[in-house]
Amino acid sequence: MSLPSSTIRPVTRRGFLGLAALGAASIGLSACATVGTGPAYVEPRPPEGPDASYGSYVTMYGPVYDGGFEIPAVPIERIDPQFLRQVVSDPTGEPAGTIIVDTSQHFLYLVLGNGQAMRYGVGLGRQGFEWAGRANVQWKQKWPKWTPPKEMIARQPELAQYSEENGGMPPGLDNPLGARALYIFQNGEDTLYRLHGSPEWNSIGRSVSSGCVRLMNQDIIDLYDRVPGRAPILVTSGIGMS
């Protein structure tokens, strides 16, 4: 298959050393597989993970060490390629720096200018469909806390331990807001609309039962780094509709 390329994060020294260690371990295991004087026969195994056609995506969606947490790699070979991060021709007509969430297609665009946009696949929860319009990113947060609303706690009493009174759920890999969150305000008031990370890569490109707009953690980190404070955002059910 042929996939478009995009900007990638360089492999960290820690990641390189980890790969080197895995290579050394593989050599050691190969030596252990040999018994006696003749060569050992090892049953071939089918290849695992993405093949070479995924190119830079292997690194783009590889493991990330961030904020004291190790974000695992995304099995990109199990995701529809259209939902992987990529530069596309801008279909929105919006000014550079604008975020557009197209809820009908499960895409988020960040307009780059010069007729191009960065496109991300998103998963949409019920709250992701409940609000539409123009607003701004009021503030951004790395590894945010999560506080379930009272209505959710009423449905799932086990979440009471993360209530506002109890300080919310601390940051971490199991936190529903993931590695980053962007908080959307309209005319100075919180819309309760969020763009946030998620470890649930299999929800990208789908509509799920709860939540706002979720991106893979690797993608929300990329978006967070690109978007300045007060960035304009348009949420619409179709490009060209506002």
Task: Describe these PLM feature segments.
Residues 1-31:
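N-terminal secretory signal peptides
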Residues 30-56:
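Bacterial Sec signal peptide processing site at the extreme N-terminus
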Residues 59-81, 238-242:
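Extracytoplasmic and endomembrane cell-envelope/extracellular-matrix remodeling and assembly machinery
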Residues 203-211:
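Short, basic/aromatic beta-hairpin or loop at an interaction surface
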Residues 8, 13, 56, 238-242:
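Mature exported/compartmentalized surface modules and terminal targeting/interaction regions
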Residues 213, 218-242:
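N-terminal targeting pre-sequences for secretion and organelle import
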Residues 76-193:
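Gly/Pro-biased beta-strand-loop elements
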Residues 124-126, 198-201:
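Short, solvent-exposed aromatic-acidic interface loops
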